[in-house]
Design a protein with these regions (language model features):
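A short core secondary-structure module
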Residues: 190, 194-238
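A glycine-rich, basic-preceded beta-loop-alpha segment at the flavin cofactor/substrate interface
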Residues: 234-236, 242, 257-286, 303-320, ...
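Flexible glycine/proline-rich, aromatic-decorated loop/lid segments
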Residues: 250-280, 394-418
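C-terminal helix-coil-helix/basic helical segment that borders enzyme active sites and/or dimer interfaces
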Residues: 337-376, 390-392, 476-488, 508-511
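Extended, charge-enriched "interface" segments that sit outside catalytic cores
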Residues: 1-103, 558-565
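Internal helix-loop-helix
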Residues: 65-152, 156-159, 200-202, 340, ...
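Glycine-rich phosphate/cofactor-binding loops in nucleotide/flavin-utilizing enzymes
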Residues: 3-25, 394-461, 529-565
Length: 565
């Protein structure tokens, strides 16, 4: 404990995996024992690289180091490139060399990303997401030429994390069918793409562009996707950078406005399947990455707040001993634990079924979970980082005291990436109407209830079952076709369904692992989510914080009788 800040010790970023017991428990839950042991070994080695990357990330975020456009070389030849700080280039190269594309499972890949993204470097994690999506679509649908000429470069440390995806134009962003960029086929089978791309994050060497081939219909049915390199024969590929956007956050990540003026590219997949392929191979993968990044920023914010609260003394007591501080930490930890649990359960399912399983219901359920996780991990992220900042008081808003001010700015950007909240919720409800969602959801809830025996969190179980009943009453099979109802209540019902799945997952894990801490977090969320704005007055977790609050928010084992929970 410290009254004087001169003896304050920053949070330890050298053991982001080893000091995350909740994440270790989760991996043991979603993986078998042998795989969990293997992942522990892999991630223990991975975490040792993070302190150096964290230091490089902090240096790259300095205002004088931010990316800049270099349009010409010293004798006036066009370059049309973005110059990155050497620290960013070093992290990217070392991340590839360390094996970010060499994994035995999706759980392994995104466990690495969850730890990596805690350094708060959007200039690495965004291009990683874009490059991953571009690799997957070229592997699945690319021509032999693309696989031979460009796939090795996308995977290499020579061109580290150099992929990007440019969809948005002034005419449309989330409304992909409104884009106006065109593509004309050349005699050699390549295409000439002309487009004014308005939001080009991670501009580097290789791009996936959405454009409309000549003669294609309007709307999304006429959109195709193309592979476009920055350079052809060492010269700029008929493209021009207008400027880099002056964004609120992720300032170390260049986001450009780019004019493509007959740029040479190659069709990826069939042109009539362009929108389908864009959604399934590019946007879905980016949304998975976005969820992992959101969880990482959420975790880093919690770690920073917990570390500060455990040292800072005010009014004669350590901050962490104050009930209101414990409640702040509890709110951040509970939301993180629940959403992280559902996210890694999704990844474990992808490992079993594959991304885009052949069976239609499985594929649509997977897409439902991907969209749900992108939305749920991001929609309160800014609020969670702000809650962590407020634990610091005025020290929380000082740029060089902690990473939190940068995380706050970046969190708002992460919320907007790959579909704002309203768009995602409406997409979720459109997808619900395309398969027997209600039977599948009922099956998932049934598994939760069946594994939740009487005598365990009885009060919470009663509240949970009532919330299930309420969902069945509000969200009937007829609702997805009611456009007015959907447009009005999309976010409310999606949040309610998500609460049921996230809390239920916590209960199942807590029961399976005999983990009181997880069960208490589940009880807390049950009361807070389903009992209304005054739930805290009757919430048994809040009432019992004097008994176990310190252990709970410190992620230590919690002992005791949970009767009345």
């Amino acid at each position: 404990m410290t009254q004087n800040l001169k003896s304050f010790k920053p949070a330890d970023n050298s053991r982001l995996f080893s000091n995350d017991p909740g994440f270790q428990e989760l991996l043991s839950f979603v993986c078998d024992e042998r795989e969990a042991d293997r992942l522990t070994s892999v991630l223990t080695a991975w975490e040792k690289k993070l302190p150096a990357w964290n230091d490089l990330s902090n240096e790259a975020a300095r205002p004088e180091k931010l990316p800049r456009v270099e349009k010409y070389d010293r004798v006036g030849n066009r370059l049309e490139k973005v110059v990155f700080p050497p620290e960013t280039k070093t992290i990217r190269r070392e991340v590839v060399e360390a094996g970010i594309f060499s994994n035995q499972s999706e759980v392994e890949k995104f466990a690495k990303i969850y730890l990596l993204a805690q350094i708060g470097e959007g200039g690495v994690t965004c291009p990683l997401a874009c490059t991953d999506g571009l690799i997957r679509v070229v592997q699945a649908l690319g021509s032999d030429f693309l696989k031979k000429e460009y796939l090795p470069k996308l995977l290499s440390a020579e061109y580290p994390l150099s992929g990007a995806q440019f969809i948005t134009e002034q005419s449309g962003g989330s409304d992909v069918g409104a884009i106006e960029g065109t593509a004309r086929e050349n005699k050699d089978g390549s295409w000439a793409i002309t487009a004014e791309k308005w939001y080009c994050s991670a501009y580097d060497e290789f791009f996936c562009l959405a454009a409309r081939p000549d003669g294609s219909p309007e709307g999304t049915r006429g959109v195709a996707i193309f592979f476009v390199p920055r350079l052809i024969d060492g010269k700029p590929n008929n493209l021009s950078i207008r400027r880099l956007k002056n964004k609120l956050g992720t300032q170390s990540l260049p986001t450009a406005e780019v004019d493509f003026e007959g740029s040479k590219g190659w069709l990826i997949g069939k042109k009539e399947d362009g929108f389908y392929n864009l959604m399934n191979y590019i946007l879905n993968v980016s949304r998975i990455h976005n969820a992992a990044n959101s969880l990482a920023l959420h975790r880093r914010a919690f770690v920073e707040a917990l570390n500060y609260a455990g040292q800072r003394v005010a009014f004669g007591s350590c901050l962490i001993d104050f009930p209101l501080i414990q409640q702040s930490l509890l709110s951040v930890l509970a939301a993180l634990t629940a959403r992280r649990g559902l996210f890694f359960s999704l990844l474990a399912g992808i490992d079993k079924q594959g991304l885009l399983p052949e069976e239609r219901e499985q594929r649509l359920w997977q897409r439902f979970l991907i969209n749900l996780m992108k939305y749920r991990t991001a929609f309160q992220l800014t609020g969670m980082v702000k809650e962590a900042i407020l634990v610091f008081g005025a020290n929380g808003i000082i740029e060089d005291f902690s990473i939190l001010p940068r995380l706050l700015r970046d969190s708002l950007i992460v919320e907007t990436w790959e579909g704002p909240h309203n768009v995602l919720c409406l997409q979720i409800l459109r997808d619900v109407g395309r398969f027997d969602f209600f039977s599948r959801f009922k099956k998932e809830i049934g598994r939760i209830v069946q594994s939740w025996p009487a005598g365990t969190l009885d009060e919470s179980r009663k509240i949970y079952l009532n919330a299930v009943k309420k969902a069945e009453e509000l969200f009937t099979k007829e609702r997805p076709a009611d456009k007015v109802w959907v447009q009005t209540h999309a976010r409310r019902i999606v949040d309610h369904l998500a609460d049921l799945l996230e809390i239920g997952g916590l209960v199942r894990q807590g029961i399976t692992q005999k983990n009181n801490r997880l069960l208490i977090l589940a009880a807390h969320l049950t009361h807070e989510s389903f009992r209304g704005p005054l739930a805290g007055f009757e919430n048994p977790v809040i009432k019992n914080l004097p008994q176990f609050g310190l252990d709970l928010v410190s992620e230590k084992p919690v002992k005791g009788d949970l009767k009345g929970f």
